[in-house]
């Protein structure tokens, strides 16, 4: 298969062709996240709170799979752009093997730490029990999840975006269909409650894996997994981790942030913890499609950077920034106009709806400007510049928001936490612009 279209096709149709399947699959994935939470919320508000409490650890494991996958994606694209097919094959082979090893480690460690982790935030043993049950089932499929992401990034690196779209949509649809059946029961299928939600997630991931495996076996790809490359290669593995570790940290930092914010908000009421969890479910409907555009850009900037096409890299960055900002503008309008209705999808508690509506109207003020940070971070990852990308994420998730949330919470209560979000996005965008310009200047 010829992959030179990445440096010859006009930039706008090229980005659209690469990003649109990602945006569609991310929208479907966002819909799954919303629908899954809606079904869990119908069990009771306690179940929704349990999901909010386990979110940081679950997000951390997802961060490991996606972040290391970004390293795989960047290395394959860079080597293909430079015309080195063998190193691209080695990157793919080692990336898949290491991803599955990560999955095994996450299963063992994740199951072991969850009871103690949950008891740090609640004394309600029924909440702990629900959280442990859900995560134990989900974590047992960590190897499948890791393999899914390795395949996804490999297909994206060679421009096979429609394959990733089909695999992700099939898994999400399976999940959405099975959620009500396994949670509430149907015919001979018993009602499994929150365990049913976890099982539906696992079945969806397995369907995605089967589709990737089938497509890989039948497709003519410019990169292949080869048994002969399964031997130690410290130099190449170090490059995978040099990009993957900062990317993992980028994605894991929200887990650290949510854990920190849960600690602040739990001192006031569990309703605030629930609202934070609902917000993170809702914001995926914006950030995942925007991330779909960034995912489409990432292999393109990597390929063109490897091919010394720096002008095309700059055009791709500007176009991605504009499209991402447009998506975030839509989200801002929705949160300002129908915030109460959005929160009401997940809770019938009047107190939770009132708190959540106010939170959304404040937090959304930083949505549009956040496009600068997300685009800059994604472009830097595609260029193989993991450390500058990590600096941007540290600003967004640690250096600005944590001190601001703590100070403003002490001064204004929980409302101060919501204001910390948009202030952080404004400050981080300024830093991101400077960091990106300096990083790409070093060619």
Enumerate the predicted regions with their spans.
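Interfacial/gating helices of multi-pass transporter permease domains
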Residues: 39-59, 125-130, 194-196, 236-243, ...
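Hydrophobic transmembrane alpha-helices of multi-pass small-molecule transporters
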Residues: 60-63, 107, 175-180, 209-213, ...
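Residue-level signal for short hydrophobic patches within transmembrane helices
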Residues: 8, 12-31, 35, 57-64, ...
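Transmembrane helical elements of multi-pass membrane transporters/channels
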Residues: 17-36, 137, 171, 204-208, ...
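Small-residue-rich hydrophobic transmembrane alpha-helices
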Residues: 48-108, 145-159, 163-164, 262, ...
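Short runs within selected transmembrane alpha-helices of multi-pass transporters and secretion channels
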Residues: 69, 73, 138-156, 164-172, ...
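Helix-terminus/linker motif at the lipid-water interface of multi-pass membrane proteins
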Residues: 27, 31-49, 118-125, 181-192, ...
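Short alpha-helical transmembrane segments in multi-pass integral membrane proteins
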Residues: 1-19, 76-143, 189-245, 301-366, ...
């Amino acid at each position: 298969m010829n992959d030179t279209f990445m440096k010859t096709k006009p930039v706008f149709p090229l980005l659209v062709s690469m990003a649109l399947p990602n945006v569609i699959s991310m929208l479907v994935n966002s819909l799954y996240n919303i629908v899954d939470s809606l079904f869990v919320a119908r069990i009771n508000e306690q179940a929704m709170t349990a999901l909010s409490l386990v979110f940081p650890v679950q997000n951390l494991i997802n961060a490991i799979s996606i972040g290391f996958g970004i390293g795989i994606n960047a290395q394959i694209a860079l080597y293909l752009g430079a015309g080195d097919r063998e190193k691209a094959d080695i990157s793919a082979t080692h990336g898949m093997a290491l991803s599955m090893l990560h999955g095994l480690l996450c299963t063992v460690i994740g199951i072991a730490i969850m009871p103690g982790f949950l008891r740090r935030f609640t004394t309600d043993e029924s909440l702990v029990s629900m959280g442990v049950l859900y995560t134990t089932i989900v974590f047992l499929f960590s190897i499948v999840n890791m393999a899914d992401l390795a395949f996804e990034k490999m297909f994206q690196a060679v421009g096979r975006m429609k394959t990733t779209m089909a695999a992700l949509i099939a898994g999400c649809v399976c999940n959405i269909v099975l959620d009500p059946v396994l949670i509430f029961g149907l015919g001979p299928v018993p009602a499994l409650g929150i365990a049913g939600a976890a099982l539906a997630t696992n079945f969806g991931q397995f369907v995605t894996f089967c589709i990737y495996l089938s497509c890989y076996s039948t497709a003519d790809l410019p990169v292949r997994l080869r048994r002969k490359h399964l031997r130690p290669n410290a130099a190449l593995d170090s490059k995978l981790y040099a990009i993957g570790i900062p990317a993992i940290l980028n994605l894991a930092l929200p887990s650290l942030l949510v854990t920190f914010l849960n600690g602040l908000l739990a001192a006031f009421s569990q309703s605030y913890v629930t609202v934070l969890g609902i917000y993170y479910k809702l914001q995926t409907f914006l950030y995942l499609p925007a991330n779909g555009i960034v995912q489409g850009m990432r292999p393109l900037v990597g390929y063109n950077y490897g091919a010394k096409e720096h002008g095309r890299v700059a055009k791709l960055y500007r176009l991605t920034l504009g499209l991402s900002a447009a998506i975030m503008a839509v989200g801002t309008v929705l949160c300002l106009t129908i915030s109460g209705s959005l929160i009401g999808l997940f809770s019938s508690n009047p107190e939770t709806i009132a708190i959540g509506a106010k939170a959304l109207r404040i937090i959304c003020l930083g949505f549009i400007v956040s496009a600068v940070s997300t685009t800059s971070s994604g472009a830097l990852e595609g260029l193989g510049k993991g450390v500058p990308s990590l600096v941007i994420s540290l600003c967004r998730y640690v250096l600005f928001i944590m001190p601001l949330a703590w100070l403003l919470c002490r001064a204004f209560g929980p409302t101060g936490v919501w204001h910390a979000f948009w202030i952080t996005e404004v400050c981080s965008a300024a830093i991101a612009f400077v960091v990106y310009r300096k990083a790409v200047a070093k060619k």
